[in-house]
UniProtKB/Swiss-Prot annotation:
The chain crosses the membrane at residues 112-132, 147-167, 209-229, 237-257. The keyword Aminoacyl-tRNA synthetase does not apply. It comes from the Bacteria. Keywords: Cell membrane, Membrane, Transmembrane, Transmembrane helix. This is Uncharacterized protein YqhQ. It is found in: Cell membrane. It is a multi-pass membrane protein. One of its GO terms (cellular component) is plasma membrane. Coiled coil: none annotated. Its main location: membrane.
Amino acid sequence: MSKHKVPPAYGGQAVVEGVMFGGKHHYVTAIRRTDGSIDFFKLPRKHNPKLNIVKKIPFLRGIAAIIEASANGTKHLNFSSERYGLDPSEDETLEQEEKKSSGLSMYLSLAVIGVLSFLFSKFVFTLVPVFLAELTRPIFSLNTAQIAIESLFKLILLLGYIYFLSMTPLIKRVFQYHGAEHKVINCYEQNLPITVENVQNQSRLHYRCGSSFILFTIIVGMFVYLLVPTDPLWLRVIDRVALIPVVLGISFEVLQLTNKVRDIPGLKLLGYPGLWLQLLTTKEPKDEQVEVAIESFNELLRLEALSEQNQKPSHNVI
């Protein structure tokens, strides 16, 4: 990337047949319906005062970011999975059902579901490699060897899981929208007009991607686990579970660091492992998928501009 002042950072994620983008004040999802139209799901960003305090504390802000992303991501995934294959004539019925279950309770339930889903997957990818590595102890008994083998099993499980997911038609399209999301962000950060042609000319990889974060948890975990014993097995399992927040917190800081130094020769290499993983989690999007991502991002920019304008103090002219 060229050296320039980067505009305000926006994040996003791919959903079923669409893309969600989040800003300081709003979240916007755009999806392509079966009739070819583009539908939007817009929500104001809820700022929890306590969570906002935590988000300013290094190593803890990563946990807060995961909680927030889990809550909002689940809502937008639900919208996309429910709407993309639904006939537009059925929208009103679905909206009435959604209103009955809206409110704080729905937000909290989605947050819990999102966090629990993340933790479950983290437990699986954390504990299964522990037991697999333990099987090799008769041959590799040293602490460092056990940790290295455990990390290798984690990487194999992760890559295998992503590869088999990508073979399904639905997830392949989600990965294409993931690529479209990155391309739009890269185009925006290059200060280029956000057109289909300009967006398609951008890389489908990005330093701030959550895929990179997942890979960093494996790398960071390998070093953190060197500080604790690997024997006996029961203590090793407890250590791995107890250290999940620590690994997540450090990994988030590493992700932020790689994004900050991405324009510095030599240091930008720190982010390469995450970019390599994105070669699996993103695919080159089609023009119509890029159009959806652009519509989502432009709508977010419009809402963000309105919010910023409304927050400016008015001056009465006398």
